[in-house]
Amino acid sequence: MEANNRRDFLKKAALAGASALMAPTLLAAEGKDESEFVLSPSKRTDSKLIVPKNNGLKITGTFLDEISHDIPHQNWGEKEWDLDFQHMKRIGIDTVIMIRSGYRKFITYPSKYLLGKGCYMPSVDLVDMYLRLAEKYNMKFYFGLYDTGHYWDTRDMSWEVEYNKYVIDEVWNTYGEKYKSFGGWYISTEISRNTKGAIGAFHTMGKQCKDVSNGLPTFISPWIDGKKAVMGTGKMTREDAVSVEQHEREWNEIFDGIHDVVDALCVSRRTHRLR
């Protein structure tokens, strides 16, 4: 009986999958528009939400994760990005942040400086595209600085400062003075602890961003090197995690050294055991 039930389930699942794949073809053959079968605003389930509409905490900004450490690059053209911006606008997003303008040899715009350092020529100028789409949908775009990759290899932050002092000037001269949607800067170097040289590096990059752009806002995204920060280790927890108290002490020191050139922070991933 159990085997028969399993076979029946598999047959039904296969038929359901085939139906889903065939639906667009059948609709096209009948001359029907797929959009007829998309939920319209009047058919949505807003009235059944546990938190009534507009009473929840609003999310108005999001990252554009085009060049990432561990997420594959999006194989999107401008049409797909335009649709994504439309969706973001509809749900209340008014700020988009490019998480980084490049990582090691992959870059998002044809930077003369970075190409001269051996980076690959991008097929599309993503920075220009994002800025145009941000203007089209009345959003603000934050530019994420370049990540050399050297910090992750050596824990030496001087590489980030050296490369980005050219990137910041180059980007502002190319895009900042051209687009009103250029709204600020994201200092993309992510740290958890008071790493040697961190305060000086963040201050130098933040100050240059503000100086060239007449004071546009800057922000960072720190994380906590907590007990569950185990990505890539094969472990569930770690014993050498920073305590919440030590984390607070170190970040008080960091903030004290950068508060005049860094305006805000967006707390990044990683978790710590609740007490």
Describe each PLM feature range.
Residues 2, 8-30:
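N-terminal export signals
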Residues 1-2, 27-47:
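Basic/polar N-terminal segments that are highly enriched at the extreme N-terminus
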Residues 6-7, 210:
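Short, cationic motifs built from Arg/Lys/His that form the positively charged side of catalytic pockets
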Residues 41-275:
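Glycan-processing catalytic domains of CAZymes
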